[in-house]
Amino acid sequence: MATWNRPHPRQPVAPEPAAEDDSQQPLGRELSEANRFAYAALCGFSLSQLFPEPEQSSFCTEFVTGLVKWLHLSESVLPTIMAFASGLGGEGADIFAQTLLQDPILRDNPSAVSQDLLSFSLKNGHYDARARVLVCHVTSLLQVPMEELDILEEVFLESLKDAKEEESETAEASRKRKEKRRKWKRYLLIGLATVGGGTVIGVTGGLAAPLVAAGAATIIGSAGAAALGSVAGIAVMTSLFGAAGAGLTGYKMKKRVGAIEEFMFLPLTEGRQLHITIAITGWLGSGRYRTFNAPWMALARSQEQYCLAWEAKYLMELGNALETILSGLANMVAQEALKYTVLSGIVAALTWPASLLSVANVIDNPWGVCLHRSAEVGKHLAHILLSRQQGRRPVTLIGFSLGARVIYFCLQEMAQEQDCQGIIEDVVLLGAPVEGDPKHWEPFRNVVSGRIINGYCRGDWLLSFVYRTSSVQLRVAGLQPVLLQDRRMENVDLTSVVNGHLDYAKQMDAILKVVGIRTKPGWREKGLPLAPGSLPQEEPLQTAIVSTDEIILQDGQSQGPASEDSLKTTIPSSASQAQMPAGLNQSTEDSLSTAAAPAEGHLICSHGVGPNPLGCPDCTHGTQESCTELD
């Protein structure tokens, strides 16, 4: 029997390909019958904890039924395992985990169960996000570091890469003749060609089908490899990596879709992974923050990461407006705090200076335009993910400010479709300018398999200002917790890290650490393999630095000087107080009034109410108007 040796964390080693006559079987079947039962019971009980919703019952039933067959357990145990998956029985998952760890095979190699469960989840060429959440959960219960699961996933891909290198000269010549005959010009760009009923998998280019199956045999066993070697099996394998294995880099909006003018994916890293991450920027600033990928250079959630480039023209105008108004506030003469109630976090009283309100259109106009466009971009992203452009792999979405709003409307749109499950693994919304009432987040439980993270800052006065006409009666997610009662929902108070709205871009490295997203230490020198041209050029910031206070992170490290968002002369002792400007001098008002005018005019809602930076749900579906009349 073949055994699995854990490779060194820094240098994953792919196992040797199995011989053709080797009757290799999955590792799970090498366990004793009692431990195979404990293995299935552990998964069943975990499913009941992770996905208790009625909408998930069909997935749990199908998964458990297939796992029992995969482990060659008697059909008589299926009702018992199904009872565990339904939440019945008093046994806990920890009991089954401890039983498994006593097995001789798992005592020295506890990751064997994770490897086998990963193999089972991938046997059909589909990697459901719910399956990965389960694999991660079981891996944690068995006290296996998550880095080892990443290695297992990488080894699976390495077997495919090795198969490509072993492609014979005859097979290569035949493939090239077919490519030339069919004139698949896009093959050079997206790495996939389908010719004469045969399929070439494009993980890193073209892979011969028999060799792909040979490489996968070492991971899923000879029986699974035989299935993958068939025409149907290779087709499903191709679907795992999306459009020819090129992920989302092969997608670019061919024509304008509705109000959207720009929408494309930029690679943040060079690499392939069984799960991908999409980062979404909220605005474009000056200096090193003028590019979409600048805030995400330390992100290390996956080896395959993308940045969504959308509506650069309007995001640049918004960024200029933000920096203009904040630069003018450097001359303010006094400040006062926004007071929040202890229980609800809703603004109790606020008095905005007349000088600031008089130049509010500097930010209101571009903000209102971007509010509408972010909603449309989110809906378009939803349809791309639903069409599996990224392949049948789990997707994690991370965004700040208007980028978080894109994610919000993406989830909202996906929740309306029946096939929305099993696509999204985790979502992270930071400083989200969206509705924070739990009833609006409830449908996301059916879309997101893993975590729904809401990162908020109680002291974000700029976000409060753009919501000034409605924030008294509206719960803004970027200012307070979202009180959704679900195991997925996680609220993270970033007040100690984020001094103002612009810090979401400038302190992203620290923010990602606080919310539990992996970052690469020393990423500038030895980080992830960055895509060519993804690292922005350093340029001096054009905006004034008005505070030299240092932010002390949770790990005790100093995070440099605070940004111009931290405009304060006094610091409130309570975390429930936020800084806001109380007055501007005449020169400041004049400089703000003469700022560049936004591209689109002042937006008036059809309901007849005055201009408002808050997007009205009744208006975002067909117009670019805003309204204070919110449900």
Swiss-Prot record:
Membrane-spanning segments: 200-220, 228-248, 343-363
Biased composition (Polar residues): 568-594
First-listed, main subcellular location of the protein, grouped into a coarse class: membrane
Record has Translocase as a keyword: no
Membrane topology: Multi-pass membrane protein
Subcellular location field: Membrane
SUPFAM superfamilies: alpha/beta-Hydrolases
Disulfide bonds: none
Keyword annotations from UniProtKB, A to Z: Coiled coil, Membrane, Transmembrane, Transmembrane helix
GO cellular component: membrane
Coiled-coil segments on the chain, per record: 156-183
Renumbered residue ranges of the record's region Disordered: 1-27, 555-595
The family this protein is said to belong to: Belongs to the TMCO4 family.
Name this protein carries in UniProt: Transmembrane and coiled-coil domain-containing protein 4
Organism of provenance: Mus musculus (Mouse)
Gene name as annotated: Tmco4
